Amino acid sequence: MYQWNLPYRKDDVETGVSSRRPLLYPAMHENPELRWGFIRKVYSIIAFQLLATVAVAATVVTVRPIALFFATTGLGLALYIVIIITPLIVLCPLYYYHQKHPVNYLLLGIFTLALAFVVGLTCAFTNGKVILESVILTSVVVLSLTLYTFWAARKGYDFNFLGPFLFGALTVLIFFALIQILFPLGRVSVMIYGCLVSIIFCGYIVYDTDNLIKRHTYDEYIWAAVSLYLDIINLFLYLLTVLRALQR
């Protein structure tokens, strides 16, 4: 495995890197080619996860008996609860084994398929127009924030300070979501809650992309991909929540 602090000099002939090659950020002390290779690998994994999510979700939406089984039977409800908690359970061993091949890929597959099933069941009872709007909006936001973060990193900006604030805000909203199970929110409150959580995950996209550019070691490609994949999926689901509330 490559090491994080691999030295890099603009005039290093052994690395084969031209002195004219731009750095990803001003204080970069590693070979840009290695970091770009790592970034491409992470985004390739994310692309595979998203394609798998689309395939599974599309199957659940189009094959109506699947969604009806989960919605109308006791066994289906029990399985749905298991599927919901599976990604949370798998995250623990995935974090521990994210550098252990091939266990990391196996756990990543289980995690992705379980979350894809959750997305599919959520979309199965949602208007197609709302789903399309959510997909388009999520794509635009993710692309815009990713490009902005790469541009900001090149200019010398750092977003590591966002970590504690995002974690604190997300913790508060998670407890708020647990409370609303006992005391359901109205339509306006659901919209406000969905917007707030969407903003938080926009912040997480910037934060995790900044970590991808500067901080993740080269053997942390699985965890880097999982972090950004979770940001994208959660952003989509909460934008979907907001748009569904608007249609009521």
From Swiss-Prot:
SS bond partners: none
Membrane topology, from the record: Multi-pass membrane protein
Principal location class: membrane
Cellular compartment(s): Membrane
Cellular component terms (Gene Ontology): membrane
InterPro entries registered for this protein in UniProt: Bax_inhibitor_1-related
Residue spans crossing the bilayer: 42-62, 74-94, 105-125, 130-150, 165-185, 188-208, 222-242
GO biological process, alphabetically ordered: cellular response to unfolded protein
Keywords: Membrane, Transmembrane, Transmembrane helix
Family: Belongs to the BI1 family.
PANTHER family: BAX INHIBITOR-RELATED, PROTEIN LIFEGUARD 3
Name by which UniProt lists this protein: Protein LIFEGUARD 3
